[in-house]
Amino acid sequence: MKKKLLIMLLLAALTLSATACGSSKEEEDPGAQKQAVTDLDNDMLESYLNQYNMDAENPIQSDDLTQEDGSASCKVTDLTVTFTTKDDDLQVAVQAKDLEDENLDVVVRDLIIAMDSELTYEEVKDMFSSFREDGRTSYDMGEVKCKLKKNSDGYRFIIEND
């Protein structure tokens, strides 16, 4: 009798631990969010977005994008992001209501790093400091050029490859 009870308790414990492990794996799978961007009208933009999605905190999916005449746009968090390609050049514009928007740093950082993977988070942080503290409106990071423009809707960050 004790042997049966012990076996039943062990089976119950194994069942509970297997169930708990299975459900936690589903919740923690970061790859589930990061699907390849496909079916865009523009191969350069598709390639860039797939590079961006590899490490971005806020990945962009094909369904998020609205395409029109060589450009695409979407919402990333509370920011409007517009991608424009011309010849071999890519321009990314990020519209924010406030320069201090906490999402702005993360999204712009990920967009810049996707454009030039040799840049570091620290270099991007220095750029933001330059814009916020020094009042600069343009910043050159080698292959990537950034501009900041104030407009009626807040601020527009423009990121271009050189």
For every predicted segment, state its role.
Residues 54-68, 117-143:
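Short glycine-rich, low-complexity/disordered patches
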Residues 79, 84-132:
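Long, charged/polar, surface-exposed segments that mediate recognition or autoinhibition
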Residues 6-15:
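Hydrophobic helical h-region of N-terminal Sec-dependent signal peptides
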Residues 1-5:
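Positively charged n-region of N-terminal signal peptides that target proteins for export
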Residues 63-102, 138-162:
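Amphipathic N-proximal alpha-helical interface segments
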Residues 31-56:
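Intrinsically disordered, low-complexity regions enriched in acidic/Ser/Thr/Pro/Gln residues
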Residues 16-20:
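C-terminal motif of bacterial Sec signal peptides marking the signal peptidase cleavage site
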Residues 22-25:
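Bacterial signal peptide processing site
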